[in-house]
Amino acid sequence: MKIVIADDHAVVRTGFSMILNYQNDMEVVATAADGVEAYQKVMEYKPDVLLMDLSMPPGESGLIATSKIADSFPETKILILTMFDDEEYLFHVLRNGAKGYILKNAPDEQLLLAIRTVYKGETYVDMKLTTSLVNEFVSNSNQDTANTTDPFKILSKRELEILPLIAKGYGNKEIAEKLFVSVKTVEAHKTHIMTKLGLKSKPELVEYALKKKLLEF
C-alpha cells in the first residue's frame, strides 16, 4: 500500500518512514510538513493511507486538512497520528473524515495494525481511549442537530474576520498584528465568538468554521 506521512517534525517523518518502508506491504511515497503540503501530496500520489499529525503550523492544521482531504479524496484513508489523548479531538476528527486515531507513543506493532486496519476500510482507535467514547461518537453522529436560528448571522464584521484566523491556529498576538488591533481586543472578540456560537473548545470552533466554508484553500 502507498502511504503519505504528514508531520511538521522532520525527525518524526524520517523515523516513521523507516519503520513503514521496512514492511513488505507498505511504501512511504511522500511526506509533508503541514496541511497544505499534505493535501498536495495526496492529490499527486493518491496514497492508500495518510498518516496525519494534528498539531501542525498555524494556517492549515491537521484538523482542517483532515476534513478537506477526506472530502476531496475519499479513497485515501486518514489515520490521525498525535500526542493528543483528549477525547474531544478524537470525536471531531472521526466526524470529519478520519478512519483512525493513534497516539505517537504507541508501540510499532500497534501503529502497523492501525495502518492495516484503516487500509481495509475499518475504523481504528488507540487502545488507551475508551469504548464508551466511540459509542458516544456514534450516538452524537446520529442525532439531528438542525437549528432554526443560525447564530452565525449575529457575529460582527470583526468577529467574522477573527473566527477563521483562530480556527487556522493563529495566536492572539499574531491575529492582533494582522488586524492592527490590540491583543486585549482579540481576546474579547474571541470570547464573544465562542459565547455567541455556543462553542466550548478549539476543535468545535474548527469544525464550525469548516461547515461554514471559512477555511477554503
UniProtKB/Swiss-Prot annotation:
SUPFAM superfamilies: C-terminal effector domain of the bipartite response regulators, CheY-like
Gene this protein is translated from: nreC
Ranges of residues in domain HTH luxR-type: 148-213
Record's protein name: Oxygen regulatory protein NreC
Record PTM 4-aspartylphosphate, positions in chain: D53
Predominant cellular place of this UniProt entry's protein: cytoplasm
Lineage: Bacteria, Bacillati, Bacillota, Bacilli, Bacillales
Record-linked SMART domains: HTH_LUXR, REC
Signal peptide residues on this chain, from the entry's feature table: none
